[in-house]
């Protein structure tokens, strides 16, 4: 809002927050693919989806968990939980995205 008030318009998604699955390379962020051998990996590449969202003015607020190598909900940090029932996993390679969306 402050930027818009100053006349700074970043694009059609200006200021819209989003989270990106931890399969996509983003400068300055680890891209772990949820797998222990890659937990410290910083890739020199930048994912096209990130570039396009950034160019449209969207704001990255989180890298979201994915199961190891995009398989299931278990990653090197544990198991991604269902925010409505912590005894359950969120399931699937989009477990982090699903949990974040369900949690609001």
Role assignments for model-derived ranges:
Residues 1-104:
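Gly/Ser-rich catalytic/binding loops embedded in alpha/beta enzyme cores
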């Amino acid at each position: 809002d402050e930027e818009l008030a100053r006349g700074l318009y970043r694009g059609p998604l200006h200021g819209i927050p989003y989270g990106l699955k931890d399969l996509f390379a983003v400068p300055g962020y680890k891209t772990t693919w949820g797998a222990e051998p890659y937990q410290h990996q910083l890739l020199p590449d930048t994912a096209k989806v990130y570039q396009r969202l950034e160019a449209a003015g969207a704001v990255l607020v989180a890298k979201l968990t994915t199961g190891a190598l995009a398989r299931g909900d278990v990653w090197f940090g544990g198991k991604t939980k269902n925010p409505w029932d912590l005894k359950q996993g969120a399931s699937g390679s989009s477990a982090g995205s699903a949990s974040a969306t369900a949690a609001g």
